[in-house]
């Protein structure tokens, strides 16, 4: 019965519209059809039929009431063969039936036939007096007496059958005219069609005029907002007709008050003046453009409901009046809003299922509904609306085009007038323009550098004028590495070398000598007296003035300022403040201005052949690879590193950095300072990079955790544009050297035919060149918690589990920081002077000002939220989400449901997908990896306070002990997690609570072991393959995810890396990192003994294996000192040729960094090496993190399921506040040169980029 009542409600709504449509159709036919003689037989027959149908249609309301009062009687009276449902669908209200009868009595016979061709109404009136309708009346409305007398059931059935027969005969009379009247009716139909076509043509002709009049009328009163636009006469008539046919329906509100109600009006612009609501039907939802929700009830207030109904009535009035709909502008306020709802609705929020239709109703709908709709639309001539709309729109377009032309004409006139005014203003005073010479502006140039730049010569080819007799030059006195002095050329002569080759020699005379001194030298040992007239390129042989005042340490005051031979290591450029970097032959380095450089008269084609043997190899490799890359240490003031000095590696600290030079102060002797080139092999980081490239014949490149905070190596590429011949030769050599094995110490030529096979493989092959303007760009959308209930007004109370609001919907699909705001919390901003602070207000109205108060509140109320759902950073946007509108390829979840949070994949560059990879949440051990996960070997705690007391928690003490070993004074509050935020890495590892602990699963010491909660997205980058970005803001220290994959041994990794690739390898070197952080441990540093009080101490060869003094230079140094002391009268004159102690660019000893004999790894077996995590074919989303030299993530080793130091979990934490839409990156810490014949340049674009990654 419930299904039948629901069907009747649906049919009632369509009943009124069909009746009004029939009434309007009658009015039109009265106007169109010509008058006929009422006395004709056809007319009389149809009048009788009209009277009969009038009696049938007047009994509907009372019959319906009887059906509602006695549904059982209705069920008994229903005949499955009778189309009673369609009759109910078309039955009008009593008021409408009266209007229709009144109209039908005045119309002609054809109008009556037309009216009754629609589906018949079910006869249900009690006022019918005809005797032949009494049985039908008794069937439709059984009285109380009849219901109590079961004996009268048979007469009732007979009467019902008679009524059905009568109803069928009535339908047959109306819908099927007799054959005698067929010819007359055909003629009348033809007349109707002719008049209808003429009327339609007249309407089409009048529509543009009416539309133009309507537009003009609207333009005249557009400025008056309160005065409505007058309607046409036809529209007013349609309104009156609509009012007469309108049915008054009393709506009973389903919700009496909004005070305690959860429901809200579906209209976002509702003023909430009414407190009564009704269920919103599909028509109301469509009117306010609100999507329908199948599992939830949607309500609308009475005001908004009446507004929608009135607007629909205006639409229906125009349709019934057969007027174009576009002549009336229906204004509806629209607001752009996004409803923030969960994808998973609460189970208990379900609308009770509506009863299904009965079989009779379904059969009726299938058979008659489509025909009824077509007939109804045909009666209102709905097909004409398309032609009318097209005509109206075309008229409007033409009118707007005319307006545009007028506006363009007015704009051109105004622009011309403005141009005339502009010219008249500026022509009043004539300005004299004077062309000045162009000025080359350089950014970030200080005044002194700019003045020096103006004094520099222009670039050009190097021209060496011939040596002339009598002119002054510089020449070597004793040795080529010593200082050069001024001489005069006395004579040019020819000499024969040992190979029988005749060369020119020059006899010179030294100036400023108390006695004449003559010598014959070659052109290579002569230099011009004046500075060069052009700028000098890389590798040019010169002598440069060395400033002795900059020398520190033991050589301070000994080395004097003079000209020394060397080569140009850096040209003049803005980065070095327009100075030359000079590599002197004896190993010293210094920056020199152009005025302090002299060009050597003759140089070899291979300039390193003229250099001292101690520096020859280094300068050769430097010149050859300068245009490719230069490895240099990136260091800052105060950093320390191992530095070689006189054959010993000592601990030195950075005092100052000057472009490519660094001033080092040795710890052994505070007075010993030295300027060293940042790419010199005497610096330990550069030396180790070179050694790794030499020893890695078949190595693999692995991502590793940084071992210490030491300076790192950055590879700089110099692309100097020059057309000089020497520079072109150097670049050719540099390019040719890239096809070699890449070993910087190897000088042997490659075998024949191996140049192509040993070519360096560049791995940067994923660049996509696109125009960013034509590609879709994402945007950050700021949501609002629309469905959130505001917190209560605070009243003094003790917080308990009843304070939070009950959860009305699931929050699994939302970001962690948005969950409180969707659960009745508020995040407020307080401003104190210029400082902004964040305060959370709980559902009970209590304000919480820090994480400690939030944690205490969550414990007291047993809230499902956790401390990682809150953050007090003012710049954090909790409800901001990154959104991309259009993509070419999109996947909903690459984890296939394994993660609690879905991980979508997008690609808006092309239709490619990432390489196939099986998703795995945790690491998977392989053959040879013995991973012991026995819980009995784990340390556990018995905390009951969510492990908030680090002093009493056993798991916390493991972490604290490791940190205190290196830094005993560090406060315990700053160690490890701080309310599940890790603000700085713990290199000794973090020990989390495990399954044996008695604490809760969401205690403060459980972070990495939880599944993914951040909303992340895999996307295709333009130059770095696939990457991963955050969809929402991530606070500093928040946990992102772990790095999972196959656990491999080093042997398996080397084997698989060469076959399948090694780009997803991560080294688990926790033991090496922790051991090198131990206090006082420096396996590779030799510290000098500063305590000279113990005279009995005598070191021997076994005490110091690394010390290998250079006896030759020691003796030479002592000889020089003795010679200087014996001849002190000649030290301060230019007569002596100063010879300094030779400093090699290459160290005189090896840096031994082998594994310590007492390493922890020896307890796990012989020849133990770090295990490797491979995410090539199996892994989680951590494999998509790209590298950056300035990353926003850092790596942390965490022990969860095992305390075996060889198998820590690798977790990623945010190193800073990351805004939504930002790519997530971490530092791979690749060792450059480890993999031979492979080059990978960094594309991160950071300011401290290393340029070369592999």
Swiss-Prot record:
Indicate which residues the UniProt annotation says bind Zn(2+) 1: 941, 943, 947, 953
List all Basic and acidic residues biased stretches. 40-57, 65-81, 136-162, 182-197, 234-243, 1081-1090
Question: Which reactions is this enzyme annotated as catalysing?
Answer: L-lysyl(9)-[histone H3] + 3 S-adenosyl-L-methionine = N(6),N(6),N(6)-trimethyl-L-lysyl(9)-[histone H3] + 3 S-adenosyl-L-homocysteine + 3 H(+)
EC number(s) given by UniProt? 2.1.1.355
Q: Where does S-adenosyl-L-methionine bind?
A: 1024-1026, 1062, 1064, 1183, 1186-1187
Q: Give the Acidic residues compositional bias ranges.
A: 1091-1106
Q: Which domain of life is it from?
A: Eukaryota
Q: Which InterPro entries match?
A: DNA-bd_dom_sf (IPR016177), Methyl_CpG_DNA-bd (IPR001739), Post-SET_dom (IPR003616), Pre-SET_dom (IPR007728), SET_dom (IPR001214), SET_dom_sf (IPR046341), SETDB1/2-like_MBD (IPR047232), SETDB_methyltransferase (IPR051516)
Name one molecular function that GO assigns to this entry.
histone H3K9 trimethyltransferase activity
Positions of the Tudor domain: 535-607, 634-691
What's one Pfam family here?
A: Tudor_4
Positions bound to Zn(2+) 3? 947, 993, 999, 1003
Question: Which stretches does UniProt call biased (Low complexity)?
Answer: 112-125, 739-759, 1123-1134
Domain Pre-SET as annotated: residue spans: 939-1011
Residue positions binding Zn(2+) 2: 941, 955, 993, 997
Keywords carried by this UniProt record: Chromatin regulator, Chromosome, Coiled coil, Developmental protein, Differentiation, Metal-binding, Methyltransferase, Nucleus, Oogenesis, Repeat, Repressor, S-adenosyl-L-methionine, Transcription, Transcription regulation, Transferase, Zinc
The UniProt similarity line reads: Belongs to the class V-like SAM-binding methyltransferase superfamily. Histone-lysine methyltransferase family. Suvar3-9 subfamily.
- What's the record's remark on domains? In the pre-SET domain, Cys residues bind 3 zinc ions that are arranged in a triangular cluster; some of these Cys residues contribute to the binding of two zinc ions within the cluster.
The protein's name in its UniProt record: Histone-lysine N-methyltransferase eggless
């Amino acid at each position: 019965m419930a299904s039948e009542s629901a069907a009747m409600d649906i049919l009632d709504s369509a009943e009124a519209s069909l009746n009004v449509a029939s009434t309007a159709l009658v009015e039109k036919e009265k106007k169109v059809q010509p008058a006929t003689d009422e006395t004709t037989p056809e007319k009389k027959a149809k009048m009788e039929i009209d009277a009969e149908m009038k009696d049938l249609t007047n009994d509907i309301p009372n019959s319906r009431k009887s059906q509602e009062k006695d549904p059982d009687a209705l069920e008994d009276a229903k005949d499955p063969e009778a189309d009673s449902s369609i009759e109910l669908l078309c039955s009008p209200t009593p008021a409408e039936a009266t209007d229709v009868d009144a109209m039908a009595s005045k119309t002609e016979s054809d109008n009556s036939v037309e009216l009754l061709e629609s589906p018949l109404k079910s006869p249900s009136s009690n006022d019918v007096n005809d005797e032949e309708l009494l049985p039908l009346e008794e069937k439709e409305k059984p009285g109380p007496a009849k219901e109590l007398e079961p004996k009268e059931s048979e007469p009732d059935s007979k009467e019902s059958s008679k009524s059905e027969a009568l109803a069928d005969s009535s339908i047959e009379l109306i819908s099927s005219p007799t054959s005698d009247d067929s010819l007359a009716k055909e003629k009348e139909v033809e007349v109707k069609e002719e008049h209808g076509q003429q009327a339609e043509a007249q309407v089409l002709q009048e529509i543009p005029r009416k539309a133009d009049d309507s537009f003009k009328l609207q333009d005249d009163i557009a400025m008056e907002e309160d005065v409505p636009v007058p309607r046409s006469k036809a529209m007013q008539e349609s309104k009156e007709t609509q009012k007469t046919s309108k049915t008054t329906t009393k709506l009973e509100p389903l919700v009496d008050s909004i005070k305690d109600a959860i429901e809200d009006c579906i209209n976002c612009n509702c003023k909430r003046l009414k407190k009564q609501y009704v269920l919103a039907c599909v028509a109301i939802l469509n009117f306010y453009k609100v999507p329908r929700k199948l599992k939830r009830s949607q309500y609308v207030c009475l005001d908004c409901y009446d507004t929608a109904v009135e607007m629909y009535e205006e639409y229906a009035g125009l349709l019934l009046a057969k007027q174009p709909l576009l002549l009336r502008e229906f204004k509806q306020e629209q607001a752009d809003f996004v409803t923030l709802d969960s994808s998973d609705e609460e189970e208990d929020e379900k609308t009770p299922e509506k009863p299904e239709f009965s079989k009779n109703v379904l059969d009726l709908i299938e058979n008659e509904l489509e025909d009824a709709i077509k007939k109804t639309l045909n009666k209102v001539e709905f097909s004409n609306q398309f032609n009318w709309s097209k005509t109206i729109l075309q008229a409007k377009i033409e009118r707007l085009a005319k307006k545009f032309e007028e506006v363009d004409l007015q704009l051109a006139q105004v622009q011309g007038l403005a141009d005339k005014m502009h010219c008249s203003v500026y022509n009043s005073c004539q300005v004299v323009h004077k062309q000045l010479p162009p000025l080359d502006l350089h950014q970030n140039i200080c005044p002194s550098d700019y003045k020096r730049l103006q004094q520099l010569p222009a670039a050009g080819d190097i021209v060496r004028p011939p040596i002339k007799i009598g002119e002054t030059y510089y020449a070597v006195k004793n040795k080529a590495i010593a200082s050069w002095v001024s001489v005069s050329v006395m004579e040019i002569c020819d000499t024969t070398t040992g190979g029988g080759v005749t060369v020119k020699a020059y006899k010179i005379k030294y100036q400023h000598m108390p006695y004449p001194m003559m010598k014959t030298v070659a052109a290579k040992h002569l230099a011009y007296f004046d500075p060069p007239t052009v700028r000098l390129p890389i590798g040019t042989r010169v002598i440069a003035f060395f400033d002795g005042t900059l020398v520190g340490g033991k050589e301070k005051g000994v080395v004097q300022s003079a000209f020394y031979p060397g080569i140009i290591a850096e040209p003049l450029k803005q980065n070095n403040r327009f100075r030359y970097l000079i590599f002197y032959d004896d190993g010293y380095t210094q920056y020199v201005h152009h005025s302090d450089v002299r060009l050597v008269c003759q140089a070899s084609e291979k300039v390193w052949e003229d250099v001292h043997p101690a520096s020859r190899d280094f300068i050769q490799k430097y010149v050859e690879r300068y245009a490719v890359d230069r490895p240099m240490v990136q260091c800052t003031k105060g950093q320390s590193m191992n530095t070689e000095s006189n054959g010993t590696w000592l601990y030195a600290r950075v005092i100052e950095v000057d472009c490519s030079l660094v001033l080092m102060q040795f710890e052994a002797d505070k007075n010993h300072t030295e300027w060293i080139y940042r790419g010199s092999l005497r610096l330990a980081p550069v030396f180790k990079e070179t050694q790794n490239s030499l020893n890695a014949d078949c190595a693999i490149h692995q991502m590793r955790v940084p071992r210490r905070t030491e300076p790192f190596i950055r590879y700089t590429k110099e692309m100097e544009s020059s057309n000089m011949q020497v520079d072109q030769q150097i670049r050719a050599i540099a390019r040719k050297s890239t096809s070699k094995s890449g070993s910087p110490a190897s000088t042997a030529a490659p075998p024949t035919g191996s140049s192509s096979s040993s070519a360096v493989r560049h791995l940067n092959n994923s660049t996509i060149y696109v125009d960013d303007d034509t590609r879709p760009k994402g945007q950050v959308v700021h949501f609002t918690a629309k469905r959130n209930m505001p917190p209560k007004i605070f009243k003094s109370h003790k917080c308990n589990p009843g304070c939070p609001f009950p959860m009305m919907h699931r929050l699994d699909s939302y970001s962690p920081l948005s969950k409180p705001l969707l659960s009745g919390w508020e995040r407020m901003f307080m401003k104190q002077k210029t400082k902004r602070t964040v305060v959370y207000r709980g559902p009970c109205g209590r304000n919480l000002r820090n994480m400690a108060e939030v944690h205490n509140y969550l414990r007291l109320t047993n809230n499902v939220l956790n401390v990682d759902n809150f953050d007090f950073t003012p710049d954090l946007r909790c409800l901001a989400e990154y959104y991309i509108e259009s993509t070419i390829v999109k996947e909903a979840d690459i984890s296939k449901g394994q993660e609690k949070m879905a991980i979508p994949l997008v690609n808006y560059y092309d239709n490619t997908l990432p390489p196939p990879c099986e998703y795995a949440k945790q690491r998977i051990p392989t053959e040879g990896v013995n991973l012991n996960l026995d819980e009995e070997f784990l340390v556990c705690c018995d905390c009951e306070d969510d492990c908030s007391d680090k002093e009493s928690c056993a798991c916390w003490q493991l972490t604290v002990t490791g940190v205190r070993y290196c830094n005993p004074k560090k406060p315990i509050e700053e160690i490890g997690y701080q309310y599940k935020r890790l603000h700085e890495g713990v290199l000794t590892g973090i020990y989390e609570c495990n399954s044996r602990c008695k604490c809760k699963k969401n205690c403060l010491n459980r972070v990495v072991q939880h599944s993914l909660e951040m909303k992340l997205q895999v996307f295709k980058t333009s130059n770095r393959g696939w990457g991963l970005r955050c969809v929402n803001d991530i606070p500093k220290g928040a946990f992102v995810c772990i790095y999972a994959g196959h656990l491999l041994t080093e042997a398996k990794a080397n084997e698989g890396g060469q076959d399948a690739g090694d780009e997803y390898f991560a080294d688990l070197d926790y033991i090496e990192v922790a051991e090198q952080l131990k206090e006082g441990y420096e396996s590779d540093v030799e510290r000098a003994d500063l305590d000279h009080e113990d005279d009995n101490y005598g070191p021997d060869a076994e005490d110091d294996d690394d010390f290998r003094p250079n006896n030759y230079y020691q003796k030479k140094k002592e000889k020089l000192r003795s010679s200087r002391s014996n001849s002190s009268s000649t030290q301060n004159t230019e007569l002596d040729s100063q010879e300094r102690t030779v400093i090699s660019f290459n160290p005189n000893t090896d840096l031994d960094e082998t594994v310590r004999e007492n390493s922890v790894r020896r307890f796990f077996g012989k020849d133990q090496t770090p295990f490797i995590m491979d995410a090539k074919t199996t892994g989680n989303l951590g494999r998509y993190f790209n590298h950056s030299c300035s990353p926003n993530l850092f790596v942390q080793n965490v022990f969860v399921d095992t305390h075996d130091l060889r198998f820590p979990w690798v977790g990623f934490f945010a190193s800073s506040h990351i805004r939504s839409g930002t790519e997530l990156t971490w530092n791979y810490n690749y060792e450059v040169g480890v993999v031979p014949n492979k080059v990978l340049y960094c594309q991160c674009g950071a300011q401290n980029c290393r340029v070369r990654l592999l």
